[in-house]
């Protein structure tokens, strides 16, 4: 039965490849594989493995022919030959390129591995050691290649059928594939070692061949240590993002009146875990000095973690200092008005430069906001205000200006968290403003998810929060908001309104990139007519990696809440700022293609 199964699985591909690559190439592959899996050898011949990998990479038909040769060896009744073949398969998966990888990730080849495990085929004769190695390999591939759906499906099927009882614990010396492409051959990474290895392999002395085997093992071990370091980094960064996200969600409950506060013990556990992750990131950063991209990822995670810890301290301390007062927006720096007894000016009080014009002046005019502040209109920290006149400030040449006149502009003064950067007031909006945009009165501006103002708190949106995972898109087609240079933004409609506020429309922004360059520092701002209210909740991220056809595209999601009490036709202006390939972009536009309100209400 075993021989029949192998013939059925390998006959067609082998014949095809012989036509393409010729009998000589196929014979060379078989020759090196026979040497690499020779069961009479006490130890595996690493030089034969190297030659086999080189033959796969140089022979045009190698990547498609080699998997079937390996499948035949893996199904061998001799335990040692099968185990040697599985080792060769792992190494080829690491170093024989994308085409070999894609062939192995097909059901046609995966079925050959499943036959070794299934009692209906070879499972009754295969040894437990061989079956254990096959399970380890399949499980490791599901971990390292999550984008290969067929591998995951095959593994899950084996678990559902009870053939795999539980996920194996991978041994420390296991050769794992890297998350990013390695050199064509691990033996070419170090030129000196490559030359030494070539010289040793050409020697006829047994001592030199033993030295070559030791050198190959050391090279494989070094690559293995590199992959483990990458795995630790990826795991730590993902844990940071996960814990900070949970911490922010729990802290956001403080600003929702009528909602139960989060469990204090659970909140403390999440916060303490965030604190413990900081030294982990420091160690990873000190060990990652030769990879700029990896170091940037670690530093970005550290900034995100620092912001989360700082937010926890601000919310907790603000709640203690101001009784039961809740900060206007979780994530924003508490406004001076939240503290009735401000401390006197000290050494850390920021100075106000009255000579510098506001960077917002031209931006607000370009976005069509009528309440553009004058040149000298600035917001003074509460510690510098005259205590006898808390509601007014005197400016040079500007007379007495009431703070209440700036309420519609406070959204843009509220700080915005940016991964990898500390917030600097008034500098989060780039100076570049597209020329020719005329001001249009009668629009209300929403600067971002952390906006805070007395005016906004008087609206239903101030205390409305819709979790991203609860948004269910409707059947209406999305609106294309922006589509240039491979960066695309869509606006989706939700099936229902906000919980407890059915008149508040829930919309979902999705941003994705098909550009070959990464996009970062993405910030989306919106404005609606004065008769409406709009609120942007925090985005899921602010960066998109460079597009890869081998990976699923990354997406930034952001929930938008819209209150339209007068049922007027919806109009929405936006300002989009981002950095792509080192070049900053600032775009302004308007979305007019909204469906009729009657259609929206029935969607």
Swiss-Prot record:
Record PTM text: Ubiquitinated.
GO terms (BP aspect): Golgi to plasma membrane protein transport; intracellular protein transport; protein localization to cell surface
Membrane topology type: Peripheral membrane protein
Gene Ontology MF term list: phosphatidylinositol binding; small GTPase binding; ubiquitin binding
Residue ranges, annotated region (Disordered): 1-22
Keyword rRNA-binding applies: no
Gene Ontology CC, one term: clathrin-coated vesicle
Residue spans of biased composition, Low complexity class: 13-22
Domain GAE: 474-595
Places the protein is found: Golgi apparatus, trans-Golgi network membrane; Endosome membrane; Early endosome membrane
Ranges for region Unstructured hinge: 318-473
Disulphide connectivity of cysteines: none
Database matches in Gene3D superfamilies: 1.20.5.170, 1.20.58.160, 1.25.40.90, 2.60.40.1230
Pfam family, one: GAT
Residue stretches making up the VHS domain: 36-166
InterPro entries: Clathrin_a/b/g-adaptin_app_Ig, Clathrin_app_Ig-like_sf, ENTH_VHS, GAE_dom, GAT_dom, GAT_sf, GGA1-3, GGA_N-GAT
Domain of life the protein comes from: Eukaryota
Keywords: Endosome, Golgi apparatus, Membrane, Protein transport, Transport, Ubl conjugation
PANTHER family (UniProt xref): ADP-RIBOSYLATION FACTOR-BINDING PROTEIN GGA2 (PTHR45905:SF2), GOLGI-LOCALIZED, GAMMA-ADAPTIN EAR CONTAINING, ARF BINDING PROTEIN (PTHR45905)
Domain notes: The VHS domain functions as a recognition module for sorting signals composed of an acidic cluster followed by two leucines (DXXLL motif). The GAT domain is responsible for interaction with ARF-GTP, UBC and RABEP1. Required for recruitment to the TGN it prevents ARF-GTP hydrolysis.
Function: Plays a role in protein sorting and trafficking between the trans-Golgi network (TGN) and endosomes. Mediates the ARF-dependent recruitment of clathrin to the TGN and binds ubiquitinated proteins and membrane cargo molecules with a cytosolic acidic cluster-dileucine (DXXLL) motif. Mediates export of the GPCR receptor ADRA2B to the cell surface. Regulates retrograde transport of phosphorylated form of BACE1 from endosomes to the trans-Golgi network.
Family to which the UniProt record says this protein belongs: Belongs to the GGA protein family.
Subunit structure comment from the entry: Monomer. Interacts with NECAP1, TSG101, UBC and AFTPH/aftiphilin. Interacts with CNST. Interacts with GGA1 and GGA3. Binds to clathrin and activated ARFs, such as ARF1, ARF5 and ARF6. Binds RABEP1 and RABGEF1. Interacts with the type-I membrane proteins LRP3, M6PR/CD-MPR, IGF2R/CI-MPR and BACE1. Interacts (via N-terminal VHS domain) with SORL1/sorLA and SORT1 (via C-terminal cytosolic domain). Binds the accessory proteins CCDC91, P200, SYNRG, EPN4 and NECAP2. Interacts with ADRA2B.
Name of the protein in question: ADP-ribosylation factor-binding protein GGA2
